Amino acid sequence: RSSAHNWAPSSGCAARAAEKADLILAVGTRLSDCVTGSQSLFRNPDVQFISINVCGHDGFKNGALPITADAREALKSLLRAAKAAGVKPRTGYLREIAAERKSWRAKAEKAGRQVRGKPLGQGTIATVISEEAQAGDTIIAAAGTQLMAAHKLAVSKPGVEYQIEFGYSCMTHEIAAAIGVRLAGRKGEVIAYLGDGGYMMNPTELVTAYQEGTKITVVVVENHGFQSIYGLQMARAGRDFGNEFRARDRQSKRLAGEYLELDFAANAASMGALTWRAASATELRSALT
């Protein structure tokens, strides 16, 4: 569960580097709420921004010096200019970042392992999806703890594309986006990764996928509701407002009873989907292949 929305879905290494940086080079980003931890990520009082973006509106955000250009070509030009000017990274800084990266990788590997006797966790699910992805595959996430886990634990691979949409949490984007990716001609597997709360907001897009004959893989995580928002509400207000799939408690009159027994696989099957249930990393790998 998340505690609030003032944190960013980056690795710990990247977050600490951003906290100290006096210059941020923003490449193709809208510097939105989730990316910047609601603008709390950058702690240096003298921080300045340079933004490379094809969209002029986004290029000016945070008072950045805008470079309206293709990201790859702009970076090539900047690298040539930096070399010509004699710009070099500080040796001490490189050592510091290397140590932070090593520490983060150790944490990520631990988060990706399933603990014996415990339910399949978000970190393990995101790690398995990343490990099973092959060149040509597309992974889509857009909201909640799935979005954060996918972003933090993904390992870059040639030809594997992550499409993560999060100006704010964008529940219901995932399945529709997966259909769009398939219709656009992507040849590999297309995986939509979402929680049960987001799934229940728009499961009928499975019917659209069926109608269009678009083969997609939908990984629905049983979170018993909107746990990211639950965490935010508990942190900010000290109580939640019915964001978990619980029965109403007769004494308190609140939705604080037992978790509801909901069969999401049966729901998806009723709309034409082939379904598998996975309670372990091994079962999830098998379902994905």
Positions of predicted regions on the chain:
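Active-site diphosphate/adenylate-binding microenvironment
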Residues: 1, 99-176, 181-182
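Glycine-rich, acidic loop regions that bind phosphate or pyrophosphate groups
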Residues: 2-97, 218, 233
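Generic structural signal for well-ordered, non-membrane alpha-helical segments
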Residues: 11-18, 67-71, 75, 90-97, ...
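Thiamine diphosphate
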Residues: 18, 59-60, 68, 75-76, ...
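Structural motif
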Residues: 23, 138, 189-191
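Glycine-rich, N-terminal phosphate-binding loop of Rossmann-like dinucleotide-binding domains
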Residues: 27-28, 143, 194
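Active-site glycine- and acidic-residue-rich loops that bind
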Residues: 32, 118-123, 198-201
